Structure formats: structure tokens, C-alpha cells
Swiss-Prot record:
Top-rank taxon, per record: Bacteria
Gene giving rise to this polypeptide: rpoC
Record-listed Zn(2+) 2 binding positions: C822, C896, C903, C906
Sorted UniProt keywords: DNA-directed RNA polymerase, Magnesium, Metal-binding, Nucleotidyltransferase, Transcription, Transferase, Zinc
Known function: DNA-dependent RNA polymerase catalyzes the transcription of DNA into RNA using the four ribonucleoside triphosphates as substrates.
GO CC term (a single one): DNA-directed RNA polymerase complex
UniProt cross-references to CDD domains, sorted A to Z: RNAP_beta'_C, RNAP_beta'_N
Cofactor: Mg(2+); Zn(2+)
Organism of provenance: Staphylococcus aureus (strain bovine RF122 / ET3-1)
Subunit details: The RNAP catalytic core consists of 2 alpha, 1 beta, 1 beta' and 1 omega subunit. When a sigma factor is associated with the core the holoenzyme is formed, which can initiate transcription.
Family membership: Belongs to the RNA polymerase beta' chain family.
Protein name in the entry: DNA-directed RNA polymerase subunit beta'
Length: 1207
């Protein structure tokens, strides 16, 4: 076998007949497969042992030679070589065809490669190949043109006139002769001359032909090899025949297809030997051609060949295509051994880095390890004995298992794996039962819940894999979300509620105002029931020993609550005492107003002080998230994970103690709800009257009514939230962020509001009842539309979002951080992203974690805040914005000069770790996952504003697809192609509006539809590429008008707009990586003296290389314009044919690659996965794998101290 790791590249080409014969181990002459009585392969048949090797290891067919000692012998009786049966997976055979046959890929593909080369139409080719017409190969004295088609009758006429003086042939033979006569160099010269003079369609055709001729010339493929004289037969184990229980046989479809070819070929040979009449031979040749077509690509031409039950047979091409094809089923997605799956249950007592494995599963997964250990400890005598002990589950097995799994991490995965946090490593602990136990905090990353979800377990076997799992994938390491750098392990549900309840304060709590010496006293008093969790008390500040308290403060009493004292025990000591949920308190110090000077208290002591003070808000989910982020910023990952565990335990403990329940009585209907409804009802009546009088249109009436009822709902919601008791359980759940929100509550206690019809249009009749009061039949019926649409949408959305992620990953999979600094001289100018007055993404968020491209000085003090190529930390970012600076140049993936992938400086901080990104990080895949994963949270719907035509704005997922596929958007905006002033806006014919822009040299007028809103005024100056009407810009057009940089920024802004409006935060750099991949090609306009072809798409780097070469030799350079490709198109245009073929349109990609003789340098991840190499990212990168080991005494201890996760 070939060693995969010695591969450097992979090349594909056409096979010459000699090459096919050299692969073959013998010719298959008979269509037989196996003998029905002996079940042995037939000699010279499709499974022949003489050709393909023995079916049993080290045993010839007749049984004369058995055992390994005869290795390499060829049996003199049956001619079978004694060797391993595995060779039946690699040895090929062949069929010598009695007549040449065309290869359907090259004749039928679009464009037809054969047609372009011969300059014949695909129709003409088809007529010749399938024996409907003759083609003139050598005209002789007839005056016919070469390649002319002749019908049967015309051929006879000419034949009678010029017997034996000219040559015209039918079938693939004629085409083969023509292909053999082609002189590629001559053809190339002619085509290059034609390029100079041709225009329009002729030019396009010439360019296409030139491309094919160049391909053949450069690749060393001969055109005649597109016609087959010899047909290869793939090894038999790849098209197996297996016996089923009933004694019947199941066989691969390929065997049927091969059988048809062999039968027809043998019949043709016989007919030729007998000298049969031409028409019979012709018919047989045509049938042979069709049989070979069906074998290569069944169904490409005509009706597909069907098997039993009218099912089309799967040909060689189908074996590669689609989700079930060789690429996606076996090469990119393999099933793995040492894996198990089971239902998950919550494991509240686990540490952050642990998971619970069911005993039986663990035993099965770690079987070989346990067996080895049993034998080593001499508990079992040999491996066989150890195996039986394990199968009987003897008692001594369990102790060994405990030992074996200690410090051996396992990987847990939940499908669908939408981002890299869908697979994490844990240290297993054995649990009873058959459910996998999962730590409650990692559920958010997996998007898992415990209603019956299942998860898969995988065991990393090698030492390297274990080390990677422990160092990089341990759940305690994955605290930040790669998409925005925020903690992903925030507490949820019970944990939030428990911590919220713990930090709540109540006015009526027992013994308010009591003063204690230290925290221990407080806890004792709480345990004895003297104070309640919600009691506000005073404690001597000095007893906290908090480093952030000033001397002054230490002399005073800290006013806080019992619960907050308990909560602060889980926070690291160097933090300020957290007494209120504000950033100030969290990042800097406890506000001074909570320190009370005991001498200033009046008669009533602290109690009186508290009675005049407002209650402090309890800590909700968002604030807990901020605490985690702050701890992460200041401490190591280990400390953070310990703090998280303590927060989780606290939350569970106190949500249990709180005993929060929900009853019908907790839903209090608003008393003056009816009054609000009546007021709005009157407003609706007024609108209806106006409509009846003809003062307003139907659309205006509808929009006004919808607005009135929306306002009514908002008013009820506002008043409801005001009137609620702060200790109402439902309010507590929604306020803490544990479950539900204000809108849910309004539906329960206020009114349900307006509903959407199945069309997406809003029904103007509102549901005025709430669930508490109950809905009328009509109201209930109206509300079912929305519910059903919601479910249908979710199902569609999941599939759409998954497909989007797949396309994104495919286009960006080869973007890896490949160098430290690319040395670019360009940068990206960033500022706030705004839509009108609404802030979409603030400037500070855009610069944090990036490298600066310029020196920034404070505008007042002139002090240097940051120099070029320095990282902008959160502190520096705050300094920059505080100085009043609103825009700056930063390093960006858009302007990175790295040839493959990006460089560290242009990418910036790695959001998953908060450190600078390292060479080898697969940032393309991370970017794709970060954009694709929130896709399921985006809405599907296009907002219908009451059926007003033209103003439907696409939003949510469809809009994201529209942007990344670079499609023409719905509701397209008109942009100006010149800089100037808006001279006039007038009505044109067909109810259109005309906008006239006057520039310095020319005046242009633009037409907009009558319904679109114009957003410029007469006399307003406009820049090139500026929007004149409301809507989305068509990006391809914008690229040619406004240029590359403006287009990149526009696409970035549009993507951010969609996600931010849905409340999803994604870092700019991910979008930048994707957009850069869409703009990495240029289209050649003029070739100059370079070898580039005009009209062809080339990689921007290849273009600059060609021009550099031209400048060196003082030749004319090529000119080109940037092209924006949608992600699907960009994936198919990638340099790597393996990656493109495994994505979509497999046959087209391979046909093209074979003719060009493409080589794949295996730079991306996908290509390497396909051939089974380590991926060239992370630890698989060359620079990390070619490491020299030095043995020293020191590192072992260091490594151990790092891997110990403190309890």
C-alpha cells in the first residue's frame, strides 16, 4: 500500500489505452460472474481469480497450494497467484473493445469538450457517434469540406461518384480519426489570431475553444484519448456480489452494466469475424456505445438502463455523486470504531471537565485497554481469558476499568454539530444506569436539553490524540464562543433563577437592619432562622479583608443582604464586593454609598436607613455572564471553570430552596384592560369612517388599523409590567432571564394581539383575550395559522441553515493562518455601522481585538495611544473612543497579502481563547461555523407590509443567502454611476420615476419603479455608487461602480445588519474571511503578452504573478477586473479539484480537471481528509509535525503541573 503521508500532490488526467492496459492484470472475456453450483468465480469472468487474485488468503483456486509458505507462487493448474485476498480490492482488469467508443463525459458535458476541440456542434457529434450520419474525414477530390455530415443517401451518391477516393466514417472511429489529426500548436495560433479580430458570439466561442486547446496542450493529454479502445474494469471487491440468507445473490449494479458491455462486445467480435452485413455491425456498434455510456454515466443520454422494478442502475458517475456518493459518504464522512451513543441526563454534581459514562458502555469502549491491564496485572492468564472475564463482567474488571479511564479523555458530540463546540472532551467518571451524564453548563454550547436528546461518545486512542483532546478540547478550556468572544457557558434556567432569588432584597424581610461583626455570624444567624436570604443587613467592612476597600471604607459598615454575602463567596478574592449589578461595581469598586458611617445613623439605626433606600436589583442572567467574562479576563481558565462550578451549585441549591412554583393565581389580569381596548376601538371606528368617506385608501386604512392595535398591545404590556408584584414567580422567571419574556407574559395576562395569516399578511382583527381569560372560538382559530406556520418555518429553516453552513465551510475551508505577518501596506477604514439613526455595530466593538494600521494620537494631549501593527486591547479600544476618535485604519482580512489563507496580524485576536491567533488556526472553518450556526435563529419570513408591492424587504436567513450567493436582491436600489448633483426628479412613462444626475462631464438619468421611495432630493450632491432609492444594492453592479473596498464594506455591513437586528452578535472578522473568499478571482479583459486567456477567471495571485513575469521581460501586462462570486460558484472555482468535486457537480468538475491535467497541491483541509492525510492546520501543520525531539529532564514535571486540573 502507498503511504499517504508521502503524498505531496495529486494529479488527474486522461488515461491512454497503453496506460489502461498497464493497470490491468488480464482481459475479462466472459460476462459470467460466479458458478451457481460451486459459488466459485468463473474463469475469465468478471470475478476471475486468475485476473483479480484469490478469494481466500494464501490459497489458489483449485486448492493445490495452501498456506503462506507458497507466497508468490502461480499455480500451474489454475493459474492463480497465491497471495492475500486483499489484492482483489486493488487489481484491475480490462476489456479490449471491438470498436472505438466515445467517453460520454467529454462528448456530453456542458460545454462539450469534444465539440469545442473539433469545432463541431454537439448535435452533429451525436449524429456521428450514434450512427445517424457519416462525417467526412478526408474529402479527396469530392469538393466537400472536412467534418461535413453526410446522410446515408448522400454518402451513397458520393461513393458511387468517387469510389475509394474519399473517406467518410460513422461512429466514434470517425471522431477518433479527426481527433488524431488535430495539430494543437497550429490550432492555438489560429485561435490567437481570431481573438484579435472576432467580436460578440464568435469571440466567446473562440475563447472557450482556446481554453480547451490550451488545456490539452499544457497537460500532455492527447485528444484521441477521449475515445476509448480499451475499457478498464474496477477491482471486484469494489463491486461485490454477496449471498443473502435466502440463497439469492445481491450484486452491485456495476456488474450488470459491465455484463451488458461484455455481451455486446463479444457479439460484435463474432459479427466482425463472420463478416456480417454493415447495417447489422453498425447497429451492434451503436449498442456497444450505449452500453459503455450507461456504464460510465447512466441516464446522461436518453432513457437510463433500469434494473428490476424499473429502478435506474447506478453507474460509475453515480458512485461519486451526491450525499451517498464515494466522496461525501466514504471519504469525507467515515464511521468510526470505539464509539457509542446514549440518551443524556443532567449531572449536577460533575466538575466542568467531567462527564458521566454508563459502566457498560465504558467497559465496551475501553475493552482493549482493560484487557491489556488485566493481563499485565496477572488477573487474567491471557487475552482470551481477559476477554471472557469482561464479557461476564466479573467484579475485578470494574476496578481495572476505573484505573484505565482515569485521565483518558473522551469526546462527546451532539448532532447537529453546527460549530466547533459541538464536540468537546471530558474526563469520564463511571455512573450507574444507561444514560450519559452531561455537565449542566455545557448544554448551551451543545444546544442540548434533557428531553430525550442523544449524544455520541468517541475515544481518542493515540497518545497524540489524547494530548490534543486534553489540551485543546477539554470542556473547561472552551469557555468562550468563537463567534463573538463572549462566554458560552453562562448559567441558564434553574441556575439563573437560584442566583436571582439569592440576591433578591425584600422590604418585609425578617430582622431588617441587623448589624453583624463578620460573615460567619451572618451565616450562623441565617442557619438559625434569625435572618432570611432577602434580609438587608449591615456587616463591618473590615471583616471582608477585601483588597479593593479603602482604609476609610474599612471603618464603616457595609449595607448589603444575606444572599449577597453568600453569593460573593464564590467570587475570587481580588474582586470588589459585588453589591449591585453594574459594570462599575464589577470592574472597579463597590460604590461608596453602600458604606455607612455608624455614627451618622439615627434612632432607628440601620432599619430606618433601609426603609428610605430603594431595593437594589437582583442579579440576572446577563449580569452573571458579565461576571464570568470579567473573571475570565483576569484569571486563568482553570480558576474560571472552578468559579462556574460554584455558581452552578449555588444556583441549583437556592432554586430548590426558593420553591418557586407557578399557579393560575399568579397570572393577574390588568384591571383597566377593557378601558384601553375601548379607547383603541374608537380610534379604529374613526379610521373606518374616514375610509368610507373616501378620505384614505384601503392600504392606508389597513396600515393605520394595524398600528392602532400594535399600540394597544404595547400599552397593555407596559402597564402590566408596571403593575406586577416583583416577587411574582412568573415575573421573577422572565426578569432573571431564566425562562420567558415580557411578550409571553402579555399573552398570558394582557392580550394576544395581532396574528399573521398563512400568507404572512397580518390579520387586522386582533385577539383581545389573553390565555388567562380564554380565547373565543374565532380567536383560537385565527391563532392556529401562526402556530402552524411557526412549526413549518422551523423545519425549513433548519435545513436551509444547514445547507448554508455547508456552502460556507466549503468556500472557506482552506483559509488557515499561514504566516505571522504578510507585510501589507493597506488597511480597512472602520467606523460605526449605522442604519439611519439606529446603531448596528459600534466602532469600539469593531476595533477591539484587531491590529492597528496607523498611529493614533490623542487629539488633545497628542499622546500616542497606539502604533501600527499593535493589538488593540479592550483598554486601548476604550481609550481610543474616549478620545473622541470615530474612525481608524485597522489590519483586516480584506487587505491581507497572504497567498493562501491569512496572516496573524490581519486576522487579529483568536476569539475562542482571547489570545493572539496562532499559525495553523483554521480560521476559515471557524468563520463559516460562526456565520452558519446562528442561521437557525434567524427568521425565515419576508416581512409583508400589508401587501404593498415593491416594499417587501427580505430579511433573516433568505437575506443572508442572497448576500453570500451574490444574487440580485429583491427590492433593488438604484445607484448612481457618476459623481455629481441630483438635477431633477420627475415622473416617467409606465408610472416610473426618473432621477437625473448631472456630473462634471455627463448627465445620466435613472429609472425607478413608481412604488420605490426616493431618498435623495433635488440639488443634493451624490458620490459615485451612492443609493438614490430605498432598498438593497445589487453587489455585482456596485463592484463595477464603487470598486473593491466599498463593495467589501457594503457586504460586511449588510450581513451585520441582518444578524444584529435579530440580536445575534458575530465578530466582523468572520464575515471578512468569507467575503474575501468571494472576491479572490479576477476576470481577464486583455491578456497582453501573458499566457492568461481573455475572459477566463483566475486567482488574483496568479494574475499578479503573470504580470510580474511580464514586467520583468518588458512585455505587455494583462488587465483584469475583480469579480464577485457567490459562495457556491466560488467553491466550484477553487484551485483544488478534489475539494470542488466533493462539493457539487462532481462529474463536471472532474471532466474539466482531467482535461486540464490539474494537480491538487493539497493545501486545504478537505483534500487532505479525502486522501486520508492529517489536515494541514493546527498540530497537523508541517512546521509543527517536523519537530525534532530533545530529551531533557525538566518538561515532564511542567506538563504535569499544567494538566492537573485543581479540584
Amino acid at each position: 500500500m502507498i503511504d499517504v503521508n508521502n503524498f505531496h500532490y495529486m494529479k488527474i488526467g486522461l488515461a491512454s489505452p497503453e496506460k489502461i492496459r498497464s493497470w490491468s492484470f488480464g482481459e475479462v472475456k466472459k460476462p459470467e460472474t460466479i458458478n451457481y453450483r460451486t459459488l466459485k468465480p468463473e474463469k475469465d469472468g468478471l470475478f476471475c481469480e486468475r485476473i483479480f487474485g484469490p478469494t481466500k488468503d494464501w490459497e489458489c483456486s483449485c486448492g493445490k497450494y495452501k498456506r503462506v509458505r507458497y507466497k508468490g507462487m502461480v499455480c500451474d493448474r489454475c493459474g492463480v497467484e497465491v497471495t492475500k485476498s486483499k489484492v482483489r480490492r486493488e487489481r484491475m482488469g480490462h476489456i479490449e473493445l471491438a470498436a472505438p467508443v466515445s467517453h460520454i463525459w467529454y462528448f456530453k458535458g456542458i460545454p462539450s469538450r469534444m465539440g469545442l476541440l473539433l469545432d463541431m456542434s454537439p448535435r452533429a457529434l451525436e449524429e456521428v457517434i450514434y450512427f445517424a450520419s457519416y462525417v467526412v474525414v478526408d474529402p479527396g477530390p469530392t469538393g466537400l469540406e472536412k467534418k461535413t455530415l453526410l446522410s446515408e443517401a448522400e454518402f451513397r451518391d458520393y461513393y458511387d461518384k468517387y469510389p475509394g477516393q474519399f473517406v467518410a466514417k460513422m461512429g466514434a472511429e470517425g471522431i477518433k480519426d479527426l481527433l488524431e489529426e488535430i495539430d494543437l500548436d497550429e490550432e492555438l495560433k489560429l485561435l490567437r489570431d481570431e481573438l484579435e479580430s472576432a467580436t460578440g458570439q464568435r469571440l466567446t466561442r473562440a475563447i472557450k475553444r482556446l481554453e480547451v486547446v490550451e488545456s490539452f496542450r499544457n497537460s500532455g493529454n492527447k485528444p484521441s484519448w477521449m475515445i476509448l479502445d480499451v475499457l478498464p474494469i474496477i477491482p471486484p471487491e469494489i463491486r461485490p456480489m454477496v449471498q443473502l440468507d435466502g440463497g439469492r445473490f445481491a450484486t452491485s449494479d456495476l456488474n450488470d452494466l459491465y455484463r451488458r458491455v461484455i455481451n455486446r462486445n463479444n457479439r460484435l467480435k463474432r459479427l466482425l469475424d463472420l463478416g456480417a452485413p454493415g447495417i447489422i455491425v453498425q447497429n451492434e456498434k451503436r449498442m456497444l456505445q450505449e452500453a459503455v455510456d450507461a456504464l460510465i454515466d447512466n441516464g446522461r443520454r436518453g432513457r437510463p438502463v433500469t434494473g428490476p422494478g424499473n429502478r435506474p442502475l447506478k453507474s460509475l458517475s453515480h458512485m461519486l455523486k451526491g450525499k451517498q456518493g464515494r466522496f461525501r459518504q466514504n471519504l469525507l464522512g467515515k464511521r468510526v470504531d470505539y464509539s457509542g451513543r446514549s440518551v443524556i441526563a443532567v449531572g449536577p454534581s460533575l466538575k466542568m471537565y467531567q462527564c458521566g459514562l454508563p459502566k457498560e458502555m465504558a467497559l465496551e469502549l475501553f475493552k482493549p485497554f482493560v484487557m491489556k491491564e488485566l493481563v499485565q496485572r496477572e488477573i487474567a492468564t491471557n487475552i482470551k481469558n481477559a476477554k471472557s472475564k469482561i464479557e461476564r463482567m466479573d467484579d475485578e474488571v470494574w476496578d481495572v476499568l476505573e484505573e484505565v479511564i482515569r485521565e483518558h479523555p473522551v469526546l462527546l458530540n451532539r448532532a447537529p454539530t453546527l460549530h466547533r463546540l459541538g464536540i468537546q472532551a471530558f474526563e469520564p467518571t463511571l455512573v450507574e444506569g444507561r444514560a450519559i451524564r452531561l455537565h449542566p453548563l455545557v448544554t448551551t454550547a451543545y444546544n442540548a436539553d434533557f428531553d430525550g436528546d442523544q449524544m455520541a461518545v468517541h475515544v481518542p486512542l493515540s497518545k497524540e490524540a489524547q494530548a490534543e483532546a486534553r489540551m485543546l478540547m477539554l470542556a473547561a478550556q472552551n469557555i468562550l464562543n468563537p463567534k463573538d468572544g463572549k462566554p458560552v457557558v453562562t448559567p441558564s434556567q434553574d441556575m439563573v433563577l437560584g442566583n436571582y432569588y439569592l440576591t433578591l432584597e425584600r422590604k418585609d424581610a425578617v430582622n431588617t437592619g441587623a448589624i453583624f461583626n463578620n460573615t460567619n455570624e451572618v451565616l450562623k444567624a441565617y442557619a438559625n432562622g434569625f435572618v432570611h436570604l432577602h434580609t438587608r443587613i449591615g456587616v463591618h467592612a473590615s471583616s471582608f479583608n477585601n483588597p479593593t476597600f479603602t482604609e476609610e471604607q474599612n471603618k464603616k459598615i457595609l449595607a448589603t443582604s444575606v444572599g449577597k454575602i453568600i453569593f460573593n463567596e464564590i467570587i475570587p478574592d481580588s474582586f470588589a464586593y459585588i453589591n449591585e449589578p453594574t459594570q462599575e461595581n464589577l470592574e472597579r469598586k463597590t460604590p461608596n454609598r453602600y458604606f455607612i458611617d455608624p455614627t451618622t445613623l439615627g434612632e432607628g439605626g440601620l432599619k430606618e436607613y433601609f426603609e428610605n433606600e430603594e431595593l437594589i436589583e437582583p442579579f440576572n442572567k446577563q449580569f452573571l455572564g458579565n461576571i464570568i467574562a470579567e473573571v475570565f479576563n483576569r484569571f486563568s481558565i482553570t480558576d474560571t471553570s472552578m468559579m462556574l462550578d460554584r455558581m452552578k451549585d449555588l444556583g441549583f441549591k437556592f432554586s430548590s430552596k426558593a420553591g418557586i412554583t407557578v399557579g393560575v393565581a399568579d397570572i393577574v389580569v390588568l384591571p383597566d384592560k377593557q378601558q384601553i381596548l375601548d379607547e383603541h376601538e374608537k380610534l379604529v371606528d374613526r379610521i373606518t369612517k374616514q375610509f368610507n368617506r373616501g378620505l384614505i385608501t384601503e392600504e392606508e386604512r389597513y396600515n393605520a388599523v394595524v398600528e392602532i392595535w400594535t399600540d394597544a398591545k404595547d400599552q397593555i404590556q407596559g402597564e402590566l409590567m408596571q403593575s406586577l408584584d416583583k416577587t411574582n414567580p412568573i415575573f421573577m422567571m422572565s426578569d432573571s432571564g431564566a425562562r420567558g419574556n415580557a411578550s409571553n407574559f402579555t399573552q398570558l395576562a394582557g392580550m394576544r394581539g395581532l396574528m399573521a395569516a398563512p400568507s404572512g399578511k397580518i390579520i387586522e382583527l386582533p385577539i383581545t383575550s389573553s390565555f388567562r381569560e380564554g380565547l373565543t372560538v374565532l380567536e383560537y382559530f385565527i391563532s392556529t395559522h401562526g402556530a402552524r406556520k411557526g412549526l413549518a418555518d422551523t423545519a425549513l429553516k433548519t435545513a436551509d441553515s444547514g445547507y448554508l453552513t455547508r456552502r460556507l465551510v466549503d468556500v472557506a475551508q482552506d483559509v488557515i493562518v499561514r504566516e505571522e505577518d504578510c507585510g501589507t501596506d493597506r488597511g480597512l477604514l472602520v467606523s460605526d455601522i449605522k442604519e439611519g439613526t439606529e446603531m448596528i455595530e459600534p466602532f469600539i466593538e469593531r476595533i477591539e481585538g484587531r491590529y492597528s494600521k496607523e498611529t493614533i494620537r490623542h487629539p488633545e494631549t497628542d499622546e500616542i495611544i497606539i502604533r501600527p501593527d499593535e493589538l488593540i486591547t479592550p483598554e486601548i479600544a476604550k481609550k481610543i473612543t474616549d478620545a473622541g476618535i470615530e474612525q481608524m485604519y485597522i489590519r483586516s482580512a480584506f487587505t491581507c497579502n497572504a497567498r493562501h489563507g491569512v496572516c496573524e496580524k490581519c486576522y487579529g485576536k483568536n476569539l475562542a481563547t482571547g489570545e493572539k491567533v496562532e499559525v495553523g488556526e483554521a480560521v476559515g472553518t471557524i468563520a463559516a461555523q460562526s456565520i452558519g450556526e446562528p442561521g437557525t435563529q434567524l427568521t425565515m419570513r419576508t416581512f409583508h407590509t400589508g401587501g404593498v408591492a415593491g416594499s417587501d424587504i427580505t430579511q433573516g436567513l433568505p437575506r443572508i443567502q442572497e448576500i453570500f450567493e451574490a444574487r440580485n436582491p429583491k427590492g433593488q436600489a438604484v445607484i448612481t454611476e457618476i459623481e455629481g448633483v441630483v438635477e431633477d426628479i420627475k415622473l416617467a412613462k409606465d408610472r416610473q420615476q426618473e432621477i437625473v444626475v448631472k456630473g462634471a462631464n455627463e448627465t445620466r438619468s435613472y429609472l425607478a419603479s413608481g412604488t420605490s421611495r426616493i431618498i435623495v432630493e433635488i440639488g443634493q450632491p451624490v458620490q459615485r455608487g451612492e443609493v438614490l432609492t430605498e432598498g438593497s444594492i445589487e453587489p455585482k453592479n456596485y463592484l463595477s461602480v464603487a470598486g473593491l473596498n466599498a463593495t467589501e464594506s457594503y457586504l460586511l455591513k449588510e450581513v451585520q445588519k441582518v444578524y444584529r437586528m435579530q440580536g445575534v452578535e458575530i465578530d466582523d472578522k468572520h464575515v471578512e474571511v468569507m467575503v474575501r473568499q468571494m472576491l479572490r478571482k479576477v476576470r481577464i479583459i486583455e491578456a497582453g503578452d501573458t499566457k492568461l486567456l481573455p475572459g477566463s477567471l483566475v486567482d488574483i495571485h496568479n494574475f499578479t504573478d503573470a504580470n510580474r513575469e511580464a514586467f520583468k521581460h518588458r512585455k505587455r501586462p494583462a488587465t483584469a477586473k475583480p469579480v464577485l462570486l457567490g459562495i457556491t460558484k466560488a467553491s466550484l472555482e477553487t484551485e483544488s479539484f478534489l475539494s470542488a468535486a466533493s462539493f457539487q457537480e462532481t462529474t463536471r468538475v472532474l471532466t474539466d480537471a482531467a482535461i486540464k491535467g490539474k494537480r491538487d497541491d493539497l493545501l486545504g483541509l478537505k483534500e487532505n481528509v479525502i486522501i486520508g492525510k492529517l489536515i494541514p492546520a493546527g498540530t497537523g501543520m508541517r512546521r509543527y509535525s517536523d519537530v525534532k525531539y530533545e530529551k531533557t529532564a525538566k518538561p515532564v514535571a511542567e506538563v504535569e503541573s499544567q494538566t492537573e486540573v485543581t479540584e
